[in-house]
Amino acid sequence: MAVDQLGVELYSIDSLGADPNLVGRVDTEGNGEQVTLTSDGVFAACDDAGAYFIPTGKFSGTGSSTRFAEDLTVDHIAVNNGIIALSLGAKGIALYDVTEPTAPVEKGIFPLGYTYKSQFWGEKLLVCSREGLQILAIEQ
């Protein structure tokens, strides 16, 4: 869970209806805005401090987090098959190859207008912007 100035917290829920148990908290630069959970860890959008990949082990004290897109304001993150789309507000979206999540590779910034959120839908990227819904094909 993104917890603004406190960074990112990870909880476990043992069964349906059970109370969540705090696994740990990772402090981030900037405000934790939104998180996307993957099998390897958590990608976190941290407003004007870019984005992070935080391996699951980091929440229990092992491993280290990877900060990237430090010079961008990241509001939302979508992940699919080793590609990550960062929603950047007025700058559009940025795409990164995160096949190796601890070493993201920038693929470009695409000015699509003011972008609020993006979501992968199959092999397409749906982008919600002031201009309306845009549907993009991502080629690797």
Predicted regions located by residue number:
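Feature marking well-ordered beta-strand scaffolds used for ligand recognition
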Residues: 1-140
